[in-house]
Amino acid sequence: MESKIRNYYAVKVTGGQEVSVGLMLEERAKTNNIPEIYSIIVPPGLKGYVIVEASGPHVVKLLIAGIRHVRGIAQGLVPKDHIVKMVSKKVTGPTIKEGDLVEVVSGPFRGMQAQVVKVTEGKGEVVLNILESAFPLQVTIPVDQVKPVKKT
């Protein structure tokens, strides 16, 4: 048996409707039992497009026919390395180390200064010692809720 050819096609959609169109395409692929659709990707940073992994453009045209907010298929194929870049997790933001002085930017401790006691990178959390409290107070909050004030 031949190996299935998998190509990525960009489907043009109305801006802001990417998630709803992606869900409608998924539902249609399931109800119409279209096995040539392998995946439907809604890239977070790409406005106005939904990526469909399929065996050919005729399958994608069959899938998108009559769906609201779909404007057509973009010409050509999307290279696989572009897809990997779009969906891979990007490490952003400043790195915070133990002993750094930080300010809490959201949550119940917003605006308070704290010292970093421990950083758990796997969970994306930091354990802080709040400096502005009357007694020693340690809290664990997500790393995106703090910003560095002073490095040690």
From Swiss-Prot:
InterPro entries: KOW (IPR005824), NGN-domain (IPR005100), NGN-like_dom (IPR006645), NGN_dom_sf (IPR036735), Rib_uL2_dom2 (IPR014722), Ribosomal_uL24_CS (IPR005825), Spt5_arc (IPR011590), Translation_prot_SH3-like_sf (IPR008991). One of its GO terms (cellular component) is ribosome. The gene is spt5. GO terms for molecular function: structural constituent of ribosome; translation elongation factor activity. This is Transcription elongation factor Spt5. It comes from Acidianus ambivalens (Desulfurolobus ambivalens). Stimulates transcription elongation. Signal peptide: none annotated. It comes from the Archaea. SMART domains: KOW (SM00739), NGN (SM00738). SUPFAM superfamilies: Translation proteins SH3-like domain. Belongs to the archaeal Spt5 family. Heterodimer composed of Spt4 and Spt5. Interacts with RNA polymerase (RNAP). Residues 98-127 form the KOW domain. Keywords: Transcription, Transcription regulation. One of its GO terms (biological process) is transcription elongation-coupled chromatin remodeling. The keyword Transcription applies. It holds the Pfam family KOW.
